[in-house]
Every structure is written in structure tokens, then in C-alpha cells.
């Protein structure tokens, strides 16, 4: 009985000591505000390259790094969009990456529906000789960003944007979706959001196939589906705000 009591006491003391050590460690406030060092990791279509966004220092902007997938120890290609900040990217082909970027241009909202950031985009063309790799600005990629690539049509991507007036202010938060040719800079409207349907997603041929909505009368989010050769949207799922079930679409 004495041995049992001694063992229990020893375990309690060890637990208290370890708890004191953990509670005694102080983290500076900056640590809690840090963004993820590495994000957006993805592989090129041919599996030969790995790209990611990496933050090298606490207050630094993300840098796009491209590695040789067969030799990750090899020095990667690095690129930033200074003075802009890369926020997302997509592989278009084995040697082309499109990305969207933002830049803080004002300290407070200036006018109706005008934020502190301005948005743009670019396309990076990789070369076997990293010094010959280059990128150019895609002015049509704005706040709505890049929605999807189109692997069957490598010169095209789907982008979205918000209608603006002559002063540059956003008039509506219902996005317009365009099929954008990255070679010629031309774009064609595919569809527009409505008050009922937003976050439209597309298939490999740029056909609108799914969307999201919300019905306040029944306090539920709605999932919409549209067949490939149809213009009719159908509700395939209603989910009340009190329902925490998770689900996702696998394909079309």
C-alpha cells in the first residue's frame, strides 16, 4: 500500500512539473499573427515540378518556388511579384503558371465598396535555364481572381470580376465569369451570378455546372446543379444552418 501511494505521488509530481514547464513558455504576440510558412503546394501536370508559396521572413510576402520533383535538394526557381503579393496560383501547362496578386494601395476604404487592395494577375513561363524564365502581367485578372484552368484548352482560363462604374467603384457583388485567352488577352462572358446563385463552378469545357445559394425563408443553404446541355438549374441539396453535416461534390 505504501509503495502504491509512493508511485502515485511520484506520477503526480512529474505531471505538475511538466505542466509548469508548458505553462511557463511565453510566445510573443507576433507568433500568433504569423501566416503559414508554406502554402498552395501543387505538382505540374507532368509530375516533373512542384510549386509552392513560401514566406521566408515574418513580415515578408509569399515567394513562388518551383522545385525539380526528381531532385528536391536542387536549388528551386524563385519569383515574387514585388511590389504586389502573390495570393494564389494554378498550373496551366507543364511550364506555365498563372497567378493572382494584390497590393495595398490605401489605408482605409475609399468610397463605396472600394477596399484597401487592388488586384491583378500574371503568367509565368518556365525555362530549363531559370534565368530565361519570365512572367508578364495579366491586367484582366482582378479582384474576382482566377476561378479555374482548362487543361483541354491550355491557352484559356476562367476568371471572374465585379462590375465597376466609371470611377472604378464596384457596382455589384454578383460576379461576371469570363473565358480568358492568356495569349491574346481577349475574354468572353460565360455567365453571371444572380441573387439566388453564386460561386459558380465549371467543367473541363467551361460549362457552368454547379453553384451555391441561400434561402432565408427556410434558413438553408442551397446546392445547385446544371446538366451539360441545359440552361436549367436544379436544387440538389438543401441544408439548414442548424445541420452541420459535411459533404462535397466529387464530379459531374
Labelled PLM ranges:
Residues 24-252:
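Beta-propeller folds
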Residues 9-18:
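Bacterial N-terminal signal peptides
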Residues 1-9:
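Bacterial N-terminal signal peptides that target proteins for export
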Amino acid at each position: 500500500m505504501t509503495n502504491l501511494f509512493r508511485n502515485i505521488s511520484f506520477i503526480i509530481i512529474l505531471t505538475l512539473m511538466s505542466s509548469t514547464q508548458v505553462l511557463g513558455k511565453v510566445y510573443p504576440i507576433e507568433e500568433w499573427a504569423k501566416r503559414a510558412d508554406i502554402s498552395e503546394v501543387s505538382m505540374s501536370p507532368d509530375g516533373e515540378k512542384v510549386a509552392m508559396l513560401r514566406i521566408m521572413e515574418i513580415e515578408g510576402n509569399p515567394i513562388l518556388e518551383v522545385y525539380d520533383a526528381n531532385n528536391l535538394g536542387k536549388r528551386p526557381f524563385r519569383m515574387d511579384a514585388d511590389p504586389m503579393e502573390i495570393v494564389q496560383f494554378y498550373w496551366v501547362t507543364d511550364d506555365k503558371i498563372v497567378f493572382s496578386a494584390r497590393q495595398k494601395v490605401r489605408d482605409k476604404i475609399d468610397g463605396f465598396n472600394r477596399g484597401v487592395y487592388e488586384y491583378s494577375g500574371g503568367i509565368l513561363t518556365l525555362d530549363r535555364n531559370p534565368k530565361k524564365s519570365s512572367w508578364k502581367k495579366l491586367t484582366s485578372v482582378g479582384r474576382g481572381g482566377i476561378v479555374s484552368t482548362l487543361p483541354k484548352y491550355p491557352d484559356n482560363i476562367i476568371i471572374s470580376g465585379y462590375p465597376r462604374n466609371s470611377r472604378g467603384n464596384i457596382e455589384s457583388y454578383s460576379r461576371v465569369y469570363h473565358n480568358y485567352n492568356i495569349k491574346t488577352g481577349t475574354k468572353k462572358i460565360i455567365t453571371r451570378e444572380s441573387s439566388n446563385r453564386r460561386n459558380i463552378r465549371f467543367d473541363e469545357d467551361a460549362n457552368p455546372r454547379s453553384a451555391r445559394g441561400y434561402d432565408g425563408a427556410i434558413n438553408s443553404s442551397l446546392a445547385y446543379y446544371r446538366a451539360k446541355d441545359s440552361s436549367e438549374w436544379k436544387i440538389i441539396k438543401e441544408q439548414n444552418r442548424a445541420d452541420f453535416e459535411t459533404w462535397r461534390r466529387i464530379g459531374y
